[in-house]
Amino acid sequence: MSEPRFVHLRVHSDYSMIDGLAKTAPLVKKAAALGMPALAITDFTNLCGLVKFYGAGHGAGIKPIVGADFNVQCDLLGDELTHLTVLAANNTGYQNLTLLISKAYQRGYGAAGPIIDRDWLIELNEGLILLSGGRMGDVGRSLLRGNSALVDECVAFYEEHFPDRYFLELIRTGRPDEESYLHAAVELAEARGLPVVATNDVRFIDSSDFDAHEIRVAIHDGFTLDDPKRPRNYSPQQYMRSEEEMCELFADIPEALANTVEIAKRCNVTVRLGEYFLPQFPTGDMSTEDYLVKRAKEGLEERLAFLFPDEEERVKRRPEYDERLETELQVINQMGFPGYFLIVMEFIQWSKDNGVPVGPGRGSGAGSLVAYALKITDLDPLEFDLLFERFLNPERVSMPDFDVDFCMEKRDQVIEHVADMYGRDAVSQIITFGTMAAKAVIRDVGRVLGHPYGFVDRISKLIPPDPGMTLAKAFEAEPQLPEIYEADEEVKALIDMARKLEGVTRNAGKHAGGVVIAPTKITDFAPLYCDEEGKHPVTQFDKSDVEYAGLVKFDFLGLRTLTIINWALEMINKRRAKNGEPPLDIAAIPLDDKKSFDMLQRSETTAVFQLESRGMKDLIKRLQPDCFEDMIALVALFRPGPLQSGMVDNFIDRKHGREEISYPDVQWQHESLKPVLEPTYGIILYQEQVMQIAQVLSGYTLGGADMLRRAMGKKKPEEMAKQRSVFAEGAEKNGINAELAMKIFDLVEKFAGYGFNKSHSAAYALVSYQTLWLKAHYPAEFMAAVMTADMDNTEKVVGLVDECWRMGLKILPPDINSGLYHFHVNDDGEIVYGIGAIKGVGEGPIEAIIEARNKGGYFRELFDLCARTDTKKLNRRVLEKLIMSGAFDRLGPHRAALMNSLGDALKAADQHAKAEAIGQADMFGVLAEEPEQIEQSYASCQPWPEQVVLDGERETLGLYLTGHPINQYLKEIERYVGGVRLKDMHPTERGKVITAAGLVVAARVMVTKRGNRIGICTLDDRSGRLEVMLFTDALDKYQHLLEKDRILIVSGQVSFDDFSGGLKMTAREVMDIDEAREKYARGLAISLTDRQIDDQLLNRLRQSLEPHRSGTIPVHLYYQRADARARLRFGATWRVSPSDRLLNDLRGLIGSEQVELEFD
């Protein structure tokens, strides 16, 4: 093989989020295809792609060179930033490069990105090789300006601190000033004896990628391509040129090429990957192993005392627990992980001691008895047949991984504690990268190309919003996409460009829960990335790379449900304390509570963790779970595999005796499998059962059985053939018929693909059960906590309020005196609406209200509140929202008066504030009036009509709280439905049609598996609810009426709904209230007295009727005086459409009682 003549030493990947385009693997692949012996990736101030690059490079036979590009500042150039490329020659250089990058982020940065001081290079120079940055470096800029003195100073710096390690970089990519700089640099090199080096400043792989690269940069910078102000800093020549191309380009400066190879030879960094480096846990004089044994045995004593209060039973059960604990401890210590368990134990115990709610465990870690003894988990693994080997397998060495759930509100407190304990420079969170996803990349590319918003929006909306959606998947899922792609050249060009950019790294963020704890400084293992203020450090390696680099990851996950449980418990225990009861311990509730399972079997699981979706409620209704094992199964069954395979139907039929229980199949079963499969009625549901079957039938160790489970999941033919043979041999040794063994193996293999981790299912089922139990026993506190958690989502709060009403709970409007930011429960067991859930009222105004209330007591009225609070925080707009929501109902006569008095109250408050300010500075001590002395009087006005009140509630709360819009229609609706309310309805006889009416509170259109569309809407008339189904013909005709908050009159057949336990109607005819009036009303009656009638009233009456004269309903005027009553029928040209607007206008003009519709 001939000696290489050139190596690329300056290349950006897409981790250079400003301008890189290609991912590390394609860059390495291209370099290998070009026959390059080595490659440097020098992303801008980061090593984010290093681990992937290092692995890909060695895999392709290419030497990876570690480096980074920097913005540099120095006193000589003032505020001007220059470029510098830094390569690591050895491991010391790699360490110094890591420190440079980390310091650049930790100092904070602005729009230009992180910056290093040139002086930092003095201390951190060892093991580093510098490329000067070409025309953008400090020497390059000084040369182009002809400032020889500055050139001399710069060169002197590098000669002093980087002898033989500073290279003048030469670039020929056709950009302005490159050649001028190059000639000056070559002359300088000859004059000062400086080495030169050639680079191509690579930004993309092929020259054809230039347009995509320009769009990528324009997306980042916020320009359109045709914007004349857009910076044009790149050229089509910045691709990965071949050795031949570079040699031809620099044929006149051969030493610049030779030096690339020389530098590549000098760069020899070894990155330690695949090892584990745990921090040292403090254990005093004991070894880590002995300390773990001690703490585990002590913990098991406490657990056994709780599990088996009866000493005789405890003595009887102890041996199996002792034996399991001993086995697990041996494996943990032999595998070198005692410190890991102790670290997790410590921060979980700290959390519990400091009021931070912790989950009972999740994932396979719940299968460890040691974890249970150390109180890392809260589920007895022996009781539920959870396997340790599913978590930590001695036959497959890998790091244990506890996923720990914490209360969302307090999780950061735990991270702070860990940082305090192990040192802030040894603890960090983990980076995560956002990429250009399908929907967003279409919008971004469309904007940069200058397409109109509507054009881009039409394409983007065709891409399904599913997580993980790609353009390729979207083309399969949405038939319109390929159609418009083929039909429209502009669409095709946009999508083709979007495909080139899809998946490119766009930005960096913080992983939701990943935390690493290092034995020394984090920067000994990975560089840091910080926010613009230099805070919140995260490792530059993502979650998989950081583990591969040797740091141990701990998952501190935030689970909203734990926050809900915590809030509920705070309210519950406050009430229990008042009643002299001990606090409720949610971990000690019985797992066989009848009230809870009765509620579960009724599918009343709205707001219950994991069990609230419609599909899950359907499954619950069919399964009728009556024990905790059934709840564990629910979590495992409600997944696409089991649902689509028929497993769920088999499970339900076996539970209810409609199918014979066999272990596992009627034809092929073995009695030894009964203990394994009995909890799931003979169905192979869990991964642990796969392992146990292999152990029982074929003598596998549980570690070996875990390997079998993994092999079945991967479905590799050669591995499965090997496992089949091992399974057969083991079964034969156990005296099991060969054919039976192979048939069972086939069944196990089939179901292994659907199998779920029982440890995870059990742990999450426990959280589900806790929320179910709280809902059953403390419904008000639980629902208040759930609504608080969803305060920012008005639509969810509306649904939860609905559930509260269904449960018979009373909800009071928000109240300025008794209300809090959150929903809470008062002493009467009523839920008080959270002020924080009012739209348009932020946290600041509420804090101002509560602060003033705590300081001066309850507010007496509106004027008092305005005088005592900071009206800069509590402005007019906020006060209007509070009035409309009902929060001031107890402070004034009615909402209309409060609203009309608001200006006076604010003016009085302003005057009071000015007077108080003057009074405080008055040398004679003449103070302003106290708030109670302020003269106040409410505006005299009529109360708002009920509909205006309700509309205000709807605007601010998202729902009607103190009334119902249907109230004003009830008398009228009776005419349409024959007086039958929804609560009085019953199934109709076959062929018989009944009419119902109500307010639409929910409406949707769904598509069945056969592709048929069905409309479903829920009617509410305050007496009850009715679900109405509209099948194809009816839906086509009436879909336009299926809108929330519309009053509908529906005729159809009523039947019993097996799912909800209520009634449902199949609609034949649907009308809104306006259509019903047109059909059934015989006239519009207007009653006036002689005292009311005058020319002005008649003129206004005419103005009200005029816009509605296109209808069919005659108008009748009833005139009343003391001695007579007359009826006047308006002419045919005055027939009207009796809409809500007309009726409300007339009632507002002459009074509600004097306007009504007439019927036969």
UniProtKB/Swiss-Prot annotation:
Alphabetically ordered keywords of this record: Cytoplasm, DNA replication, DNA-directed DNA polymerase, Nucleotidyltransferase, Transferase
GO cellular component: cytoplasm
Catalytic activity, reaction form: DNA(n) + a 2'-deoxyribonucleoside 5'-triphosphate = DNA(n+1) + diphosphate
Pfam families xref list: DNA_pol3_alpha, DNA_pol3_finger, DNA_pol_IIIA_C, HHH_6, PHP, tRNA_anti-codon
Cellular localization per UniProt: Cytoplasm
InterPro entries reported for this sequence: DNA_pol3_alpha_NTPase_dom (IPR011708), DNA_pol3_alpha_thumb_dom (IPR041931), DNA_pol3_finger (IPR040982), DNA_pol_IIIA_C (IPR048472), DnaE2/DnaE/PolC (IPR004805), DNAPol_HHH (IPR029460), NA-bd_OB-fold (IPR012340), NA-bd_OB_tRNA (IPR004365)
A GO BP entry: DNA replication
GO molecular function: 3'-5' exonuclease activity; DNA-directed DNA polymerase activity; nucleic acid binding
EC number: 2.7.7.7
UniProt record similarity statement: Belongs to the DNA polymerase type-C family. DnaE subfamily.
Role description: DNA polymerase III is a complex, multichain enzyme responsible for most of the replicative synthesis in bacteria. This DNA polymerase also exhibits 3' to 5' exonuclease activity. The alpha chain is the DNA polymerase.
Subunit structure: The DNA polymerase holoenzyme is a complex that contains 10 different types of subunits. These subunits are organized into 3 functionally essential subassemblies: the pol III core, the beta sliding clamp processivity factor and the clamp-loading complex. The pol III core (subunits alpha,epsilon and theta) contains the polymerase and the 3'-5' exonuclease proofreading activities. The polymerase is tethered to the template via the sliding clamp processivity factor.
The protein's name: DNA polymerase III subunit alpha
Naturally occurring in which organism (per UniProt): Escherichia coli O157:H7
